Amino acid sequence: MTGKIKIGINGFGRIGRLVARVALARDDVELVAVNDPFITTDYMTYMFKYDTVHGQWKHHELKVKDEKTLLFGEKPVTVFGCRNPEEIPWGETGAEFVVESTGVFTTKEKASAHLKGGAKKVVISAPSADAPMFVVGVNHTEYKSDIDIVSNASCTTNCLAPLAKVINDRFGIVEGLMTTVHAMTATQKTVDGPSSKDWRGGRAASFNIIPSSTGAAKAVGKVLPALNGKLTGMAFRVPTVDVSVVGLTVRLEKKATYADIKAAIKEESEGKLKGILGYTEDDVVSTDFIGDNRSSIFDAKAGIALNDNCVKLVSWYDNEWGYSSRVVDLIVHMSKTQ
């Protein structure tokens, strides 16, 4: 595939808008279309330009050309408002890759509707029950060009998997438990409200620490089969708007001091996993990672070892920006695999 990779985005929520920001700031991809049936173009412009967490968009002047076109500088982006994915005419815009970021069409069958509109490939920006999951830096090289629908897994899996890979490759993981202290997301409630499937999840997000389930740790077993059945985990939703942190407690096959583990992670962060896995010895807190495009930043000072076989590791992630960056990275990798 030559030239810029043309992408479309279905669903202009948190991840959809940030994938757009990432794409527009890069020179190897081109945003050509956005679909969202619930947002007008003028409101879309406002939501894109002003962001409470990531700040005001200042790269290009942004304006509405007409009700079906946005202008990023001189670059037109077509806007659709279709509720049914198969009705979105991606082919008219040349969109080869579609980012499915509504959170609704997350199965292969549902996401395949985009192919009927002319898209060549679909990347689901969420875990999927049946689409193959790829985590950049972990198993993305296993992607084959005949796979049309993929999942970029979850933000937490993208944080955990690179860390788990390094530890398992170097020392072996017997078993482990993960806890993610996770920033609140759009699915939560501003004040106590109905949430019949998750009673605790219906409590006020800004005033509570809320225990929650997550499939992120088990999903690591899908991208790293050697760890299948060895990891599980849970989440605490906390009253912050962005940046989350994983605590991974593992029992090791090979004895290793905490210094050995730090050295291994540092080496990988400067080698094969550079740009994916980070390493810091600074006295950091969550807001220090807003806008960090790495998937996982290991906090060397925060971890602890019980002994040479049992250790707790801590790694930060901007659950919005880092994840959105990987969505685009995965698209670029897929295009090169054609």
From Swiss-Prot:
Hey, where's the site called Activates thiol group during catalysis on this chain?
182
CDD domains referenced in this protein's UniProt entry, alphabetically:
GAPDH_I_C, GAPDH_I_N
Signal peptide, first to last residue: none
Q: What is its EC number?
A: 1.2.1.12
According to the record's subunit comment, the protein's assembly and interactions are:
Homotetramer.
Do you know which NCBIfam families this protein is assigned to?
Answer: GAPDH-I
Official protein name in the record: Glyceraldehyde-3-phosphate dehydrogenase, cytosolic
Query: Source species, please?
Result: Ranunculus acris (Meadow buttercup)
